[in-house]
């Protein structure tokens, strides 16, 4: 059975990869920042939440 910690780690890796690819493309495309600003901030919030949750679940003894 897969625990919650590996799930958070996999999600963190996926979101990190998506942000590494998407943010430079959005910033480099003229006019795209105005349209995609909410998506970038939502992704940053999701990434931050995953970092915190991963740390919390890693610190809690099993």
Curated annotation (Swiss-Prot):
Entry annotated with the keyword NAD: no
Protein localization: Plastid, Chloroplast thylakoid membrane
Gene3D superfamilies: Photosystem II PsbZ, reaction centre
Transmembrane spans: 8-28, 41-61
Membrane topology: Multi-pass membrane protein
Coiled-coil zones: none
Top-level taxon: Eukaryota
UniProt xrefs under Pfam families: Ycf9
Alphabetical UniProt keywords: Chloroplast, Membrane, Photosynthesis, Photosystem II, Plastid, Reaction center, Thylakoid, Transmembrane, Transmembrane helix
Residues in the signal sequence: none
Entry GO terms, CC: chloroplast thylakoid membrane; photosystem II reaction center
InterPro entries reported for this sequence: PSII_PsbZ, PSII_PsbZ_sf
GO terms (BP aspect): photosynthesis; photosystem II stabilization
Quaternary structure annotation from Swiss-Prot or TrEMBL: PSII is composed of 1 copy each of membrane proteins PsbA, PsbB, PsbC, PsbD, PsbE, PsbF, PsbH, PsbI, PsbJ, PsbK, PsbL, PsbM, PsbT, PsbX, PsbY, PsbZ, Psb30/Ycf12, at least 3 peripheral proteins of the oxygen-evolving complex and a large number of cofactors. It forms dimeric complexes.
Function: May control the interaction of photosystem II (PSII) cores with the light-harvesting antenna, regulates electron flow through the 2 photosystem reaction centers. PSII is a light-driven water plastoquinone oxidoreductase, using light energy to abstract electrons from H(2)O, generating a proton gradient subsequently used for ATP formation.
Family from the record: Belongs to the PsbZ family.
The protein's name in its UniProt record: Photosystem II reaction center protein Z
Organism encoding this protein: Emiliania huxleyi (Coccolithophore)
């Amino acid at each position: 059975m897969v625990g919650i910690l590996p799930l958070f780690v996999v999600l963190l890796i996926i979101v990190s990869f998506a942000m590494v690819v998407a943010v430079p493309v959005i910033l480099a495309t003229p006019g795209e920042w105005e349209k995609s600003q909410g998506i970038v901030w939502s992704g940053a919030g999701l990434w931050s939440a995953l970092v915190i949750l991963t740390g919390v679940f890693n610190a809690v003894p099993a």
